[in-house]
Design a protein with these regions (language model features):
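Primarily extracytoplasmic/secreted proteins
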Residues: 1-221, 227-241
Length: 241
């Protein structure tokens, strides 16, 4: 396996704010960082954090989210300072992966918003046909955490072969729910990720992304620890209402 999940960093706010910073401490230079911000009752327009590249953003006026990526520098410049218009409760996360290319790393992405306005318990992303050996990431943003995943002990599942990298399991109903899942593709089979909850359900949206692998294998250095969590605050991923 060329790709590996290295660390997850997150932050959240249960009160209405217009900005939130995720501190990325100890990221390995040249690793891939993917950040997601989700805002409830706000987030009409997001400002791209310095040094990050926008992948996708969407707003309904009551809920908004944005997804970004950057190649890690291994310095404090990796911190993700998210900001947006219209204050709201929020969750944000940054996930670090190794094994990526360091240029032209984002291959393709596809957003799905057709479940917004509906109350569902299952959401399937759009499908992508990847290059063998690349990384697929699926980022889920849900309007209201109380409907999608309550209490925190009832975790959301993602369909095989995807695995969850991060999710907001600690937020109250006033915060949005968000999750990020990943899969390293062994072939060119067209794939989508399905997120499921056994709760009442809510209004989800998603973006699925493909990232290129390094030509010579893993690019970062240092030990890899599966899902090491350095969360701050009450926790949040990247979704907004």
């Amino acid at each position: 396996m060329a790709f590996a999940e290295v660390s997850t960093y997150s932050n959240s706010s249960g009160s209405g704010v217009g900005s939130l910073t995720v501190t990325v401490s100890g990221a390995v230079a040249n690793n891939l960082l993917v950040g997601q911000i989700t805002v409830r009752n706000g987030g009409d327009a997001f400002t791209t954090p310095t040094g990050w590249t926008l992948i996708d953003t969407h707003s309904t006026g009551a809920f908004g989210y944005a997804t970004y990526y950057r190649i890690a520098s291994g310095t404090s410049a990796d911190d993700a300072a998210f900001s947006w218009t219209d204050n709201g409760t929020c969750y944000a996360a940054v996930v670090e992966y190794s094994g990526n290319a360091t240029s032209s790393v984002l291959v393709q992405s596809s957003e799905k918003t057709s479940d917004l306005g509906s109350t569902v318990t299952t959401h399937t992303t759009n499908s992508l046909t990847p290059t063998a050996g690349n990384l697929l990431l699926a980022a889920l943003a849900v309007l209201h955490n109380a409907g999608w995943n309550t209490p925190a002990s009832q975790t959301t599942t993602v369909s095989s072969p995807f695995s969850l990298s991060d999710e907001n399991t600690t937020a109250s109903g006033s915060q949005p729910y968000a999750a990020i899942a990943y899969y390293e593709t062994p072939d060119t089979t067209t794939r989508a990720a399905t997120f499921t909850t056994n709760d009442a359900g809510s209004e989800p949206a998603s973006v699925i992304m493909e990232f290129a692998a390094a030509a010579g294998g893993i690019t970062g250095t240092g030990a890899i620890t599966e899902g090491a969590d350095t969360s701050a605050g009450s926790g949040a991923i990247f979704s907004y209402i």
